[in-house]
C-alpha cells in the first residue's frame, strides 16, 4: 500500500516523515509493523493497545529487539478501559524505556483520565498524538 500512496500522492516518503497508527488491536498492529519495518515507519501512534492479545506477543517483540530503533512513539490508554488495559500499557511503556526510548523525548506516554476504550475517546486525543509525532517546524523563507 505504501508504494502506491507515495506514487499517487505528494508525500515525503522517508521514515522520518511516515507514520503508522491504530487503536486497540490496531495499535498492536501499528507497533508490530513499525518494529518490523523501522526504516519505513518512523512514527508510531499506539492508542489503547490490546497488549494482552496473543498472550502479550507485542511485549515479547519489544523485549527481543537487539537495538532501539530511531522511531518516535506515542503510547496512550484511558484509565476507564477495564480489563487491565492501563496496567498493560504501562508494561509496554516500561519495555520500551528498557530498550532505550526516552519518555517525553522519543516516547510519549499519556493516560487519559476517565476515558474508555472507544472511538470518541481516541478522537478527542488524536490532536495530541499528531502534535507529538509531527511537531511544527519553522519554514525558512
Protein language model annotation of sequence segments:
Residues 2-141:
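Non-catalytic cap/lid and distal C-terminal segments of serine-dependent acyl enzymes
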Amino acid at each position: 500500500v505504501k508504494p502506491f500512496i507515495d506514487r499517487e500522492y505528494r508525500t515525503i516518503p522517508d521514515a522520518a516523515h511516515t507514520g503508522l497508527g491504530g487503536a486497540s488491536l490496531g495499535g498492536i498492529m501499528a507497533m508490530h509493523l513499525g518494529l518490523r519495518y523501522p526504516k519505513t515507519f518512523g512514527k508510531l501512534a499506539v492508542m489503547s493497545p490490546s497488549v494482552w492479545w496473543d498472550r502479550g506477543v507485542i511485549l515479547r517483540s519489544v523485549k527481543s529487539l537487539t537495538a532501539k530503533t530511531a522511531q518516535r512513539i506515542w503510547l496512550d490508554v484511558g484509565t476507564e478501559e477495564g480489563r487491565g488495559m492501563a496496567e498493560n500499557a504501562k508494561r509496554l511503556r516500561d519495555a520500551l524505556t528498557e530498550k532505550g526510548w526516552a519518555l517525553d523525548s522519543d516516547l510519549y506516554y499519556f493516560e487519559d483520565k476517565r476515558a474508555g476504550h472507544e472511538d470518541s475517546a481516541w478522537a478527542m486525543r488524536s490532536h495530541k498524538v499528531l502534535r507529538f509525532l509531527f511537531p511544527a517546524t519553522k519554514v525558512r523563507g
